[in-house]
C-alpha cells in the first residue's frame, strides 16, 4: 500500500488545522472501482439528457469522463499525487524576493463543475530553505486539480509554501476567468477575478509589498 510523503502529510495537516482543506470524505475504494461507478452514473446522466449512448461519438463518453475525473482533472483530491518536493538549504544566503510568474491554472468551479482558468504569480523570500522552481508550478497544479473555489485555491498554495519553506514570507496572486460567469448565468464575457494572499514581510513591509504588487501589475499589463 502506498503511503503519503512527509511533505504531503505536513501540507494536508496544515490545511486541516486552518480549515482550508477541501470538503473531502474518506472513501477507501480502489480507483478502478471508482471509475466504474462514475461511468455508470454518467450513463444515467446522459440518458436523462436524452442523449443516444449508442451513437458512435457518445459510446465511450462515460468511460472517458470517469477516467478524466479520477486520473486527471480531480487527481489533486488524492495526496498520493502530491508532487515530490525538493527543499534545498539556503547556503547562498538568498534574502531577496524570488518570483515565478505566469503559472498556468486550469481548475473546475465546485459550484457548477465548469472550468475556470488563468495565471498565478508566486513570490517568497527565503529563510533557511529554498525550493526547486518547478516544484512551485507543481504545487499550483496539484491544488488546481480539484473542484475548487479560487479563494480557497489561493490560500492553499499560500499555506502549502509557508509550511514547506518554514517561512511566513510568501505572496500569491491569481487572475482567472470563470466560465460559470462567462458561459452561463450572467454571460459576462470580459470580467476576471483576482485573489491575493500576503504573509510575513509581504504584509508588514511596505516596500516589499509594493515590489510584489508592481510585479503582478507588470505581469498583467
Curated annotation (Swiss-Prot):
Zn(2+) binds at residues 109, 112, 180. GO terms for molecular function: GTP binding; GTP cyclohydrolase I activity; zinc ion binding. It is an enzyme of class 3 (hydrolase). Its EC number is 3.5.4.16. Coiled coil: none annotated. GO terms for cellular component: cytoplasm. GO terms for biological process: one-carbon metabolic process; tetrahydrobiopterin biosynthetic process; tetrahydrofolate biosynthetic process. Keywords: GTP-binding, Hydrolase, Metal-binding, Nucleotide-binding, One-carbon metabolism, Zinc. Pathway: Cofactor biosynthesis; 7,8-dihydroneopterin triphosphate biosynthesis; 7,8-dihydroneopterin triphosphate from GTP: step 1/1. It catalyses: GTP + H2O = 7,8-dihydroneopterin 3'-triphosphate + formate + H(+). NCBIfam families: folE, PRK09347.1-1, PRK09347.1-3. Toroid-shaped homodecamer, composed of two pentamers of five dimers. Belongs to the GTP cyclohydrolase I family. This is GTP cyclohydrolase 1. It comes from Blochmanniella floridana. The gene is folE.
Amino acid at each position: 500500500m502506498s503511503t503519503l510523503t512527509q511533505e504531503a502529510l505536513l501540507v494536508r495537516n496544515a490545511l486541516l488545522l486552518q480549515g482550508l482543506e477541501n470538503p473531502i470524505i474518506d472513501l477507501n475504494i480502489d480507483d478502478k472501482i471508482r471509475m466504474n461507478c462514475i461511468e455508470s452514473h454518467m450513463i444515467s446522466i446522459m440518458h436523462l439528457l436524452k442523449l443516444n449512448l449508442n451513437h458512435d461519438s457518445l459510446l465511450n463518453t462515460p468511460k472517458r469522463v470517469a477516467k478524466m475525473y479520477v486520473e486527471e482533472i480531480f487527481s489533486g483530491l488524492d495526496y498520493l499525487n502530491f508532487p515530490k518536493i525538493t527543499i534545498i538549504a539556503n547556503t547562498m544566503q538568498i534574502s531577496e524576493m524570488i518570483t515565478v510568474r505566469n503559472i498556468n491554472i486550469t481548475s473546475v468551479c465546485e459550484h457548477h463543475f465548469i472550468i475556470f482558468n488563468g495565471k498565478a504569480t508566486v513570490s517568497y523570500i527565503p529563510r533557511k530553505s529554498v525550493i526547486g522552481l518547478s516544484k512551485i508550478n507543481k504545487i499550483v497544479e496539484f491544488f488546481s486539480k480539484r473542484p475548487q473555489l479560487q479563494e480557497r485555491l489561493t490560500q492553499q498554495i499560500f499555506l502549502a509554501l509557508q509550511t514547506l519553506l518554514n517561512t511566513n514570507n510568501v505572496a500569491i496572486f491569481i487572475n482567472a476567468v470563470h466560465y460559470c460567469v462567462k458561459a452561463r448565468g450572467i454571460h459576462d464575457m470580459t470580467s476576471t477575478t483576482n485573489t491575493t494572499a500576503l504573509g510575513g514581510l509581504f504584509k508588514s513591509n511596505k516596500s516589499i509589498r509594493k515590489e510584489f504588487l508592481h510585479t503582478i501589475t507588470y505581469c498583467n499589463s
